Amino acid sequence: MPLSPGLLLLLLSGATATAALPLEGGPTGRDSEHMQEAAGIRKSSLLTFLAWWFEWTSQASAGPLIGEEAREVARRQEGAPPQQSARRDRMPCRNFFWKTFSSCK
């Protein structure tokens, strides 16, 4: 399933917004630095994963067809277009409703 650019932007903005929220109680000193570092690592990991996933889905959707799918596409491209029925040629006019409407093609 390809990830649309709009959805990717929404996910990234959500990750940025939650990483920027202050914590309740406000830890101070070394704990605060550690929490900020952990949040930065999580944010970086999430962004790396989303970039990898977007690249992977883009390659998967543009990848070549293999096996049965390739044969089916080749058969459809090489084959003659489907023939229209000869019944239309024999019966060009048809009454749809009694005494009201007829269609001639």
Curated annotation (Swiss-Prot):
GO terms for biological process: adenylate cyclase-inhibiting G protein-coupled receptor signaling pathway; chemical synaptic transmission; regulation of cell migration. It comes from the Eukaryota. Keywords: Cleavage on pair of basic residues, Disulfide bond, Hormone, Secreted, Signal. GO terms for cellular component: extracellular region; extracellular space; synapse. It is found in: Secreted. Residues 19-74 form a propeptide. The keyword Signal applies. Disulfide bonds join 93-104. Residues 1-18 form the signal peptide. One of its GO terms (molecular function) is neuropeptide hormone activity. Its main location: secreted. Expressed in a subset of GABAergic cells in the cortex and hippocampus. Belongs to the somatostatin family. Binds to all human somatostatin receptor (SSTR) subtypes. It also inhibits cAMP production induced by forskolin through SSTRs. This is Cortistatin.
